[in-house]
A protein has these predicted regions:
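N-terminal Rossmann-fold NAD(P) dinucleotide-binding loop
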Residues: 184-185
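Adenosine-nucleotide cofactor-binding segment
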Residues: 174-180, 192-223
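Glycine-rich beta-strand-centered segment in the early N-terminal region that forms part
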Residues: 18-35, 48-93, 115, 135-140
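Nucleotide donor/acceptor-binding cores
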Residues: 1, 26, 172-173, 197
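Cytochrome P450 core scaffold surrounding the K-helix E-X-X-R motif
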Residues: 40-45
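NAD(P)H dinucleotide-binding glycine-rich loop of Rossmann-like/cofactor-binding domains
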Residues: 91-178
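Short glycine/threonine/proline-enriched tight-turn/helix- or strand-capping micro-motif at secondary-structure
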Residues: 11-19
Length: 223
């Protein structure tokens, strides 16, 4: 399969590597439908020292399940799924408190434990806790805008939503979002969805704050 690797600042290569295989009974193998670039990828793209040992890239994915380990019960081959940016069992004490990135049995992609997701196929550890099934959508027939929206659920929108959720945004609340980047705009959208009455967006880019207004910001404070 083809997969993406970072060898140093500005040095991204697409290389042929072996297809992933089930390593643990809780794993799943998925076929990538869409993957994307995150701001955290760009940090390394601009700063990583040159190395002969590359870093596999990517942690945002929508995909179709190809194979599951014998202990996987919540997904099956053929399911269309979203893979959030970290993998977790979703049953440990931390996961039950909503802190999945601190999962006792979880981790992050692009590490020795789990390769990056900018690849044609990927191994997903702890598949029962790490994959979310998208019902009633055929990715081969779905509209491009729907696929792009679903891809946002793998990381950037979740980050903004989590901020709003942890900030107890709800009906009638007043909130301020500082920053008009992708996460900030996602927080605006999430806050509107959660019922905030007044959403103040602070930003310095007119095109982005205009988008924030379209997405639910009631006021903009420009820098």
């Amino acid at each position: 399969m083809k997969a993406t690797f970072l060898y140093g600042a500005g040095d991204v290569r697409v290389e042929t590597v072996p297809d992933p295989a089930i390593r643990f009974p809780t794993d799943a193998i998925v076929r990538t439908v869409r993957a994307c670039v995150c701001g955290s990828d760009l940090h390394r793209y601009h700063s990583m020292p040159a190395s002969t040992t590359p870093r596999s890239m990517g942690h945002e994915l929508i995909a179709v399940v190809e194979e599951v380990g014998p202990e996987v019960t919540t997904v099956r081959p053929g399911d269309f799924v979203v893979a959030p940016f970290a993998w977790q069992d979703n049953t440990c004490a931390f996961c039950r408190e909503g802190m999945q990135t601190a999962c006792l049995h979880g981790g992050f992609y692009g590490t020795p434990e789990a390769a990056g997701l900018q690849a044609e196929f990927a191994r997903i550890p702890q598949a029962d806790g790490s994959l979310v099934v998208v019902p009633d959508v055929d990715p081969d027939a779905a509209d491009e805008s729907l696929l792009n929206s679903l891809l946002a659920l793998s990381d950037v929108y979740l980050t903004g939503y989590h901020a709003a959720h942890m900030g107890r945004v709800g009906p009638g609340t007043t909130i301020t979002v500082i920053g008009d980047g992708a996460v900030g705009l996602s927080a605006v959208l999430a806050s509107r969805t959660l019922g905030a009455e007044r959403i103040i967006l602070m930003g310095r880019h007119r095109d982005r704050t205009d988008l924030g207004t379209d997405w639910g910001a009631t006021e903009v404070v420009a820098e």
